[in-house]
Amino acid sequence: SYRANYNASLVKIKQVSSLASEGIYYRLSTMLTKPVNISQTMAHDSLLIKLLEEEGSRYQEAGYQETIRKYLDTYKNKYAYDSVFLVSASTNNYYNFNGLDRNLARGEDENVWYYNFLQSGEEYSLNIDNDEVAGAANKITLFVNCRIRDASGRVIGVVGVGVNVDYIKGLLQEYEKEYDVATYLINEKGEIEVSSLYNGHQTADWFKVNDSEDI
């Protein structure tokens, strides 16, 4: 009957949607797990912890800054990330694969992510922002931020990696073609973080974009 066929079609649609969601979720989880794991590995590296503990006495040494630069550059090249960075909690100096980049002064909009993360209590977080480092052309980037603690548990720095959002958008476009569905990464507020059309730096409400405000 029509109703039986209709109900069967609904079940099939739900099954396909569920499989698509699971497949996309698995792939995205796999993609995001690696940069988180790499960032956590650096956060627990005794060499990096020692370098941060020695910053006060060695900061002016050219060799000190070069050691940090080489360390971060090695991770960038090995894992092909767009950015690898380190921030000292004692000086707020921001280092990346090119060396000392800048100081993250409190009260400046582009540094809010850093102070919010320190105050959050989270061991790691993901945020989307412009890459402010020299030569990055302000590209929209997904950053992983991880706390670095000394032996007593005191936070002495933040380390992490960055992945260009265009790369993630490209993956979502591939998934949309493969599964014939629209894909979005949204936060707890219902705002679109990344999709094939949005880069996360624009504020877009998923419910409004999809005319689903009554859900």
Residue ranges of predicted features:
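Juxtamembrane extracytoplasmic/periplasmic/luminal helical "stalk" adjacent to the first N-terminal
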Residues: 1-57
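Generic recognition of well-ordered alpha-helical segments
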Residues: 19-26, 37, 70, 112, ...
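Short hydrophobic alpha-helical segments used for membrane anchoring or interfacial signaling
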Residues: 44, 84-92, 182-190
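Amphipathic coiled-coil signal-relay and dimerization helices
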Residues: 49-52, 87-99, 190-197
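Extracytoplasmic/periplasmic sensor domains and loops in membrane signaling proteins
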Residues: 58-71, 98-131, 197-215
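Solvent-exposed, extracytoplasmic
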Residues: 65-78, 154, 158-202, 210-213
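Extracytoplasmic/periplasmic ligand-binding sensor regions of membrane-associated signaling proteins
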Residues: 77-80, 88-164, 168-170, 174
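Short loop/turn microsegments at loop-to-beta-strand junctions
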Residues: 82-83, 143-144, 180-182
